[in-house]
A protein has these predicted regions:
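Hydrophobic faces of well-ordered beta-strands that scaffold small-molecule active sites
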Residues: 5-10, 34-36, 57, 65-69, ...
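Conserved, mostly hydrophobic/aromatic
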Residues: 19, 26, 37, 81, ...
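Catalytic cores of alpha/beta
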Residues: 22-23, 73-84, 149-161, 203-219
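Glycine-rich, proline-tolerant flexible connector loops at the mouths of alpha/beta enzymes
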Residues: 34-49, 93-101, 117-119, 169-175, ...
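Glycine/Thr-rich beta-alpha phosphate-binding loop at enzyme active sites
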Residues: 40-48, 52, 144, 148-150, ...
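Alpha-helix-loop-beta-strand connector modules within alpha/beta enzyme cores
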Residues: 47-68, 131-145, 180-201, 237-240
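Glycine-rich phosphate-binding active-site loops on the catalytic face of alpha/beta enzymes
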Residues: 89-98, 165-174, 214-234
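C-terminal helical cap(s) of enzyme catalytic domains, especially alpha/beta-barrels
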Residues: 102-111, 212, 224-240
């Protein structure tokens, strides 16, 4: 399946003190969309932005806003992110985990820390479908995401998902290394799913080809993009 390769620079790695300038760099680079990571300090061990910042980015950017909700109970905030100007809204399957939910691997009662992420062996498919359908009812694209250690447990919701996002690092912080174990899951999903497959975490010009070859067609790049002197060239190298 030949799908156009899209690049989505992540604002998580941007300098928020000059955010408008950073957005202009994305626009001028030839990238396809802007990726915004929303974190609540509970689902992941970091706090980032909310609807107010998404709305501010919307006012500055004439690009697709790809909003990734790494939060608990995302259904409570869908309308807020719709109203803020999101074009794509992605929720985590682990936010609606069923039996087999592992909230904090190797926790040892110390709280969710960097290098950990919530995992799920199965999900409440009905609940996930409801939220995906709600997102689409507003005319937005709906995505579902999986953390690196979660198995491919979303087959039952694919018909309602415009996009599947694989986290290839443990979510919460930028600058991490790509987790190779995600590649087989991308390959397995592509065999049964014709929609968009997005990958986020540790992506650069050295591993982009293997990710694309596995079946992904949207690459999120944070540290690699904002660390590049020539950002247009960085985007071209990711596309291959």
């Amino acid at each position: 399946m030949n799908k156009k390769i899209l690049v989505a620079p992540s604002l998580l790695s941007a300098d928020f003190s000059i955010l408008k300038d950073e957005i202009k760099k994305i626009e001028d680079s030839g990238a396809d969309m802007i990726h915004l990571d929303v974190m609540d300090g509970h689902f992941v061990p970091n706090i980032t932005i909310g609807p107010l910042i998404v709305e501010a980015v919307r006012r500055c950017a004439d690009m697709i806003l790809d909003v990734h909700l790494m939060i608990e109970e995302p259904h409570k905030f869908i309308k807020d992110f719709v109203d803020s100007g999101s074009d794509i809204i992605t929720i985590h399957a682990e936010a609606y985990a069923g039996e087999g939910f592992k909230p904090y691997p190797a926790l040892n009662n110390q709280g969710l820390r960097k290098g950990m992420s919530k995992t799920a062996d199965n999900i409440d498919e009905g609940r996930v479908k409801e939220v995906l359908r709600e997102i689409k009812s507003f005319g937005k694209k709906a995505g579902v995401s999986l953390n690196p250690d979660s198995p491919l447990c979303i087959e039952g919701v694919l018909e309602d998902a415009d996009m599947v996002l694989f986290m290839s690092v443990h979510p919460g912080f930028g600058g991490q290394s790509f987790i190779e174990a995600v590649l087989p899951k991308i390959k397995a999903l592509r065999k049964i799913y014709s929609g968009d497959i997005e990958v986020d975490g540790g992506i650069n010009d050295r591993n982009a080809k293997s990710i694309i070859d596995a079946g992904a067609n949207i690459l999120v790049a944070g540290s690699y993009f904002f660390g590049a002197k020539d950002k247009s060239d960085a985007v071209k190298k990711l596309r291959g």
